[in-house]
């Protein structure tokens, strides 16, 4: 599996489509805004492709190999926020997500990693999917922090791997930082 940092100018339609189909609309930052936000804050947006013979960058890989997934990580001094993690629906359940997550954890070893996911406890149409996702993260060394949030009617649970704890205050600080970046983002224009 090959992975490449994503340059906003080189983001191809397959990457955009995966982002826009893997997450409910209410959980997405609009694509144009996400590309602008990447110019304001330090986000590690990585795309993953099947191994192939040779290529030099993400745009070349996109033409010669199948897209396996994407991740967006917000590296912070205290911990890393695993913000978005997606594998195409037709490839789920084949161990690809496990390989990507293993690479991510290895890349960011030495610091704890935090993620939020739709709560497996909330009664909803996709409750089985949420339970499978929660079990996936538990199998991969994440644990529930006891911190939760609700946004646009969706309950989220915060999970962590690594040492230490994660508190509501930690979560509130991240949200304040994100708002600050959002407010300072260059406007379209």
Question: What is the meaning of each model-derived region?
Answer:
Residues 1-33, 60, 169-189:
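Short amphipathic alpha-helix that is part of the acyltransferase structural core
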Residues 87, 93-107:
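Conserved acetyl-CoA-binding loop-helix of GNAT-fold acetyltransferases
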């Amino acid at each position: 599996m090959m992975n490449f940092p994503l340059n906003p100018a080189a983001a191809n339609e397959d990457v955009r489509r995966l982002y826009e189909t893997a997450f409910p609309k209410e959980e997405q930052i609009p694509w144009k805004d996400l590309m602008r936000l990447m110019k304001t804050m330090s986000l590690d947006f990585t795309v993953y492709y099947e191994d192939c013979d040779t290529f030099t960058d993400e745009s070349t890989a996109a033409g010669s190999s199948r897209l396996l997934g994407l991740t967006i990580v917000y590296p912070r001094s205290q911990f890393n926020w695993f913000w978005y993690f997606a594998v195409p629906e037709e490839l789920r359940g084949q161990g690809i997500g496990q390989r990507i997550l293993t690479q991510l954890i290895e890349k960011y070893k030495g610091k704890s990693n935090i993620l939020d996911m739709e709560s497996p406890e909330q009664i909803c149409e996709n409750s089985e999917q949420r339970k499978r996702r929660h079990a996936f993260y538990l199998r991969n060394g994440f644990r529930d922090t006891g911190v939760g949030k609700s946004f646009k009617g969706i309950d989220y649970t915060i999970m962590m791997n690594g040492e230490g704890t994660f508190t509501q205050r930690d979560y509130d600080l991240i949200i304040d930082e994100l708002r600050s970046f959002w407010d300072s983002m260059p406007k379209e224009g």
